Amino acid sequence: MTARNLFLLPGDGIGPEAMGEVRKIIAYMNEAMNAGFVTDEGLVGGCAYDAHGAAISEADMQKALAADAVLFGAVGGPKWDSVPYEVRPEAGLLRLRKDLQLFANLRPAICYPALAAASSLKPELVEGLDILIIRELTGGVYFGEPKEIIDLGNGQKRGIDTQVYDTYEIERIAGVAFEMARTRQNRVCSMEKRNVMKSGVLWNQVVTETHKAKYSDVQLEHMLADAGGMQLVRQPKQFDVIVTDNLFGDMLSDVAAMLTGSLGMLPSASLGAPDGKTGKRKALYEPVHGSAPDIAGKGIANPIAMIASFAMCLRYSFNLVKEADDLEKAIANVLDKGIRTGDIMADGARQVGTVEMGDAILAEFKTLSA
């Protein structure tokens, strides 16, 4: 069978500990399922700066470009707060996104039933919540030009950012949203501000045209982004897939994440365009949480977000849908049994460390996949 090439970038802080639990799952899948994963590993972030003077080396960048998928841990920490801006730890992630041309950011907001009480909303509003927010990652106001602060010469300054979207950028992110919806509940809600922004008018038009041309089997709804934020808090389970631009996606995905009550448990994926010959997309998978340097090396970090990111990798990079389903179910089963790391501890639960949580999830995964 064809090898499945994974490039692991554990990074800083708790990244290596969390990645260690994914390695166990990869080893089991290779042994028991003949999965054919071939792994290589590199440095990114502060540890890469310490070793190479850059947030990611050129050699590791080439390995990332050659891999079928990249698994990324976390970067940063106080140790590197004073390094030059262009080689700060976060620059490694930005370089990966840029060079891999990752334009679609997928952020699931999943509320495991066992953790519904941890949400700031009533449990009945969020229990069983499963939203996928798809954010355009390489266009919009974060990248548009001009972007500057100018001196007006009268004691005043003017800050300028430019919101820019071209048709092709909207078409391709809409295509990802419709394709993902087909594998879920077949519903997409597109969010923009067409009432006050010309880019929002174009966004609405292009999403509508793309839907009509290729995806008319998917249910499409349009919503103003501010109303969408309100509805996410009012009645979140009305949504399946939400697609939006870079700025609104940045905000709405964090709002949706907090509905779950467990920001540190959520995965994400960033996808590129399909290859013209193979149809495969470049992809990077990472937990939403940061490097948590205060608990690094203590063996208490929660590995669930990293494991759930690997489940997304199985689903979107390798089309191993059953295996992805089983791994996500294994996480839910472990939580149902009252097994918790300290960050999600609850009355009556049993507190465990990183390795024990990883072992418990692997044991459930073995049972489900037997």
Curated annotation (Swiss-Prot):
The keyword Amino-acid biosynthesis applies. One of its GO terms (cellular component) is cytosol. The record marks Y142, K193 as: Important for catalysis. It catalyses: (2R,3S)-3-isopropylmalate + NAD(+) = 4-methyl-2-oxopentanoate + CO2 + NADH. Its EC number is 1.1.1.85. It is an enzyme of class 1 (oxidoreductase). Binds 1 Mg(2+) or Mn(2+) ion per subunit. GO terms for molecular function: 3-isopropylmalate dehydrogenase activity; magnesium ion binding; NAD binding. Substrate binds at R97, R107, R135, D226. SUPFAM superfamilies: Isocitrate/Isopropylmalate dehydrogenase-like. It is found in: Cytoplasm. Disulfide bonds: none annotated. NAD(+) binds at residues 77-90, 290-302. InterPro entries: IsoCit/isopropylmalate_DH_CS (IPR019818), IsoPropMal-DH-like_dom (IPR024084), Isopropylmalate_DH (IPR004429). One of its GO terms (biological process) is L-leucine biosynthetic process. Its cofactor is Mg(2+); Mn(2+). It comes from the Bacteria. Keywords: Amino-acid biosynthesis, Branched-chain amino acid biosynthesis, Cytoplasm, Leucine biosynthesis, Magnesium, Manganese, Metal-binding, NAD, Oxidoreductase. Pathway: Amino-acid biosynthesis; L-leucine biosynthesis; L-leucine from 3-methyl-2-oxobutanoate: step 3/4. Its main location: cytoplasm. Mg(2+) binds at D226, D250, D254. Belongs to the isocitrate and isopropylmalate dehydrogenases family. LeuB type 1 subfamily. Catalyzes the oxidation of 3-carboxy-2-hydroxy-4-methylpentanoate (3-isopropylmalate) to 3-carboxy-4-methyl-2-oxopentanoate. The product decarboxylates to 4-methyl-2 oxopentanoate. Homodimer. This is 3-isopropylmalate dehydrogenase.
